């Protein structure tokens, strides 16, 4: 006999959540949402000044003890391993990992430099493997953990001039499945959120481009850009006990873009 699920299943009180690339934009909003749901959050970035400013803002609203900052390069395995060890020793075991760090590089493929291809793939795909594996070692041992990889509509679609990005995000979708396949038996759930076109300070130039803005509004059934707030609820769900039987999935939060032609 089934019983109704309590909203307590979404409560993250006592959980430690590491969110990569969280000093600004989408990552910052996701970390803020997890903290609002009760989690102790560890912010990450490589710009120490911006990271400290974000931590100070969060601490003022969520409490000093529930907000921490770890500056490390998600593509450097030695830094990642050291940072994860320090977080687990000083803050506590990592219960939730959000692999959000990402970069974009727009150029036609015939003009794309190999170094730029490698940089985008390293940040957008390889970092999720490096950080995910480092954190999952503890999760598997404890037999409990949640990994949320931030993909994109480009996990499913392609668009001209962003070949390394769409390749990396497509790879991230299958990396998510691989994590579920290998770690699911240890009660680790790995899922992906695939945002559509989200209005942030990092996409403001696209919003300001009249032709591109018209394309987004016309291509999206919701007829609007998404907001960071649209991604918070799904992230809390995938980080919580409410999603314990969800594994290896990609949730598209795109206003219906990938549902239509």
Map each language-model feature to its residues.
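Short C-terminal tail/terminal secondary-structure segment
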Residues: 2-8, 157, 235-236, 247-261
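Conserved glycine-rich Rossmann-like NAD(P)H-binding loop of the short-chain dehydrogenase/reductase
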Residues: 37-54
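Residue(s) in the substrate-gating loop at a strand-loop-helix junction
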Residues: 152
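Active-site helix of classical SDR
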Residues: 132, 168, 176
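Substrate-binding pocket helix/loop in short-chain dehydrogenase/reductase
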Residues: 108-109, 116-121, 147, 216
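Conserved glycine-rich cofactor-binding loop
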Residues: 16, 23-25
């Amino acid at each position: 006999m089934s019983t109704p699920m309590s909203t307590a299943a979404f409560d993250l009180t006592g959980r430690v959540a590491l969110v990569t690339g969280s000093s600004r934009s989408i990552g910052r909003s996701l970390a803020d949402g997890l903290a609002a749901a009760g989690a102790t959050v560890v912010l990450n970035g490589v710009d120490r000044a911006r990271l400290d400013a974000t931590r100070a803002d969060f601490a003022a609203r969520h409490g000093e003890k529930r907000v921490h900052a770890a500056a490390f390069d998600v593509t450097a395995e030695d830094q990642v391993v050291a940072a994860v060890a320090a977080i687990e020793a000083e803050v506590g075991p990592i219960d939730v990992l959000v692999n959000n760090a990402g970069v974009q590089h727009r150029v036609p493929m015939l003009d794309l430099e190999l170094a730029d291809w490698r940089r985008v793939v390293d940040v957008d795909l390889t970092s999720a493997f490096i950080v995910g594996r480092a954190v999952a070692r503890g999760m598997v041992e404890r037999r409990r953990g949640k990994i949320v990889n931030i993909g994109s509509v480009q996990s499913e679609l392609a668009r001209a001039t962003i070949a390394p990005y769409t390749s990396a995000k497509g790879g991230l979708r299958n990396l998510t499945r691989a994590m579920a396949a290998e770690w699911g038996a240890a009660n680790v759930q790995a899922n992906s959120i695939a945002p559509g076109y989200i209005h942030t300070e990092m996409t403001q130039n696209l919003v300001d481009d009249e032709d591109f803005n018209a394309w987004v509004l016309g291509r999206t059934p919701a007829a609007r850009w998404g907001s960071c707030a649209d991604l918070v609820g799904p992230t809390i769900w995938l980080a919580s006990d409410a999603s314990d039987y969800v594994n290896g999935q990609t949730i598209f939060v795109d206003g219906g873009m990938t549902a239509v032609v």
